[in-house]
Amino acid sequence: MAQNSQNGNSSNQLLVPGAAQAIDQMKFEIASEFGVNLGAETTSRANGSVGGEITKRLVSFAQQNMSGQQF
């Protein structure tokens, strides 16, 4: 399996240039709020809580931006 040079084994591709930096900043801010030290020694439960919160906030942000728009 080919590796994405920016995200290790991730097959996700960001569509917006510079989004990786914003997502990383959000990840570390949320980890700090939750008292999680991100790294290889962190449990998957702790890492997962950070990832879940990122998803929750991104969905909320998208819903706010899309409110009132019809497709």
UniProtKB/Swiss-Prot annotation:
Record-marked site positions (Cleavage): E29, I30
InterPro entries xref list: SASP_alpha/beta-type, SASP_alpha/beta-type_CS, SASP_DNA-binding, SASP_sf_alpha/beta
Database matches in Pfam families: SASP (PF00269)
PROSITE patterns the record matches: SASP_1, SASP_2
UniProt entry tagged with the keyword Ubl conjugation: no
Single GO BP term: DNA topological change
Gene3D superfamilies in alphabetical order: Small, acid-soluble spore protein, alpha/beta type-like (6.10.10.80)
Keywords: DNA-binding, Sporulation
Superkingdom as given in the UniProt entry: Bacteria
The UniProt record lists the keyword Cytoplasm: no
A GO molecular-function annotation: double-stranded DNA binding
Additional observations: SASP are degraded in the first minutes of spore germination and provide amino acids for both new protein synthesis and metabolism.
Functional summary from the UniProt entry: SASP are bound to spore DNA. They are double-stranded DNA-binding proteins that cause DNA to change to an a-like conformation. They protect the DNA backbone from chemical and enzymatic cleavage and are thus involved in dormant spore's high resistance to UV light.
Family named by the database record: Belongs to the alpha/beta-type SASP family.
UniProt protein name: Small, acid-soluble spore protein 2
